[in-house]
Regions:
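Alpha-solenoid HEAT/ARM repeat scaffold
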Residues: 8-12, 42, 69, 100-104, ...
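Primarily the internal scaffold of c-type cytochrome electron-transfer domains
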Residues: 1-15, 69, 94-109, 165, ...
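Short, intrinsically disordered, charge-balanced linker/junction segments flanking boundaries
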Residues: 1, 186, 250, 325-328
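Amphipathic alpha-helical scaffolding segments comprising HEAT/armadillo-like alpha-solenoid repeats
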Residues: 1-2, 22-34, 51-61, 80-94, ...
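Extended surface/linker regions that mediate inter-domain or inter-protein docking
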Residues: 124-125, 138-145, 163-168, 173, ...
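HEAT-repeat alpha-solenoid elements in large eukaryotic scaffold proteins
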Residues: 99-102, 140-160
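Core register positions within helices of long alpha-helical scaffolds
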Residues: 13-20, 46-50, 74-77, 105-112, ...
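Alpha-helix N-cap/helix-start positions at coil->helix boundaries
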Residues: 7-8, 38-39, 65-69, 96-101, ...
Length: 328
């Protein structure tokens, strides 16, 4: 305690000593959770991590953010301490933790545990307006991957094959929280919710998504995500939403609509008109999007438009910012 983490050699020696004690008498080390010195409690956490003792979960309730952070790392990282994982996952219920490293591990702990109640916890956390916005978005992205999690850990990048889960588990929690999520005060959360609906092919939100897609007061990113989601779930109002988005003031929204229309109805007459408008747009992204969509079409009209662009390139009249897009 008197060293107070100042001498790293003493600190390391102390950790090794505590780990040795913990192997013989874990209770002796666990009792340090009540010690008044933060440095002692930190050393206790590191020692418990070395011996893989699940009692380290006690330190998740510590008053020191450093200690809680160390405990979260101990439970989650490297080879982990599986028996303590539920305690880490449960931190999302508390509402008192604001540390991003801790919350990321708590979110991922729920993904790794993979039970229906863990999916529900992620949705509840994402719907909580007082939680950090970035972490609410992370919870939604994690929920989006629920049926088939990526094999590289979302926090560490370590290989972890979590297998597959029924997509219905994610659908069930969205049934209960979709209203809160799509009406959130956070634009980022609403956008992430729309993306989750797309990835999970969740079909019970079409009416709400249509309202988002047509709401001119919202950002283009949210409206574009809503249109994408309507297309992904093949909602009844998807074609109408795409048609409305084609006429939007936002180039981002128009570009999204053109891309979706090319997938839904590549022979639509308004598609070629929109692509021609996109090529003449003052916005680079819309021009690039139009070229990309043209490259995916096989109609004679599309080929003709592309040939016109390659001729511009050959003559040196095409903007330098579009050279690569035309060649591709």
């Amino acid at each position: 305690a008197t060293n107070d983490n100042k001498d790293v050699f003493l600190r390391h020696a102390g950790v090794l000593a505590l780990a040795k004690v913990g192997e013989e008498s874990p209770r002796s080390v666990l009792q340090l959770a009540r010690h008044g010195s933060e440095s002692v409690r930190l050393a206790a956490v590191v020692a418990l991590r070395r011996i893989g003792n699940s009692g380290v979960a006690m330190f998740l309730n510590d008053t020191s953010e450093k200690v809680v952070n160390e405990a979260a790392h101990a439970i989650h990282d490297e080879f982990s301490i599986p028996a303590a994982m539920p305690s880490l996952a449960g931190l999302l219920d508390v509402g008192l933790v604001s540390s991003e490293p801790v919350l990321r591990r708590a979110i991922n702990a729920n993904l790794r545990l993979g039970r229906p109640q863990n999916a529900m916890r992620l949705a509840k956390f994402a719907a909580r307006e007082t939680a950090p916005e970035a972490m609410r978005v992370e919870a939604l992205r994690t929920l989006s991957s629920w049926p088939s999690p990526f094999k590289l850990d979302r926090v560490e990048g370590r290989f972890r094959d979590l297998g597959t889960r029924p997509v219905e588990q994610a659908h069930d929690v969205l049934d209960q929280h979709i209203g809160e999520l799509l009406s959130s005060k956070s634009d980022a959360v609403r956008g992430a919710t729309a993306e989750a609906i797309s990835k999970l092919n969740y079909g019970n939100a079409a009416e709400r998504l249509t309202r988002l897609a047509n709401d001119n007061s919202l950002t283009a990113a949210i409206r574009a995500s809503a249109v994408e989601a309507l297309h992904s779930i093949d909602a009844d109002g998807a074609d109408e939403a795409v048609a409305a988005a084609l006429k939007a003031e936002s180039p981002e929204l128009r570009a999204t609509a053109v891309r979706i229309l090319a997938k839904r109805n590549p022979d639509a007459g308004e598609l070629m008109a929109s692509l021609q408008s996109g090529l003449k747009s003052d916005h680079l992204r819309e021009q690039q999007n139009a070229l990309g969509v043209l490259g995916s079409l096989k109609s004679l009209e599309a080929v003709s438009l592309l040939e016109a662009q390659t001729k511009r390139l050959a003559k040196g009249t095409a903007p330098a910012t579009l050279h690569l897009d035309i060649l591709e």
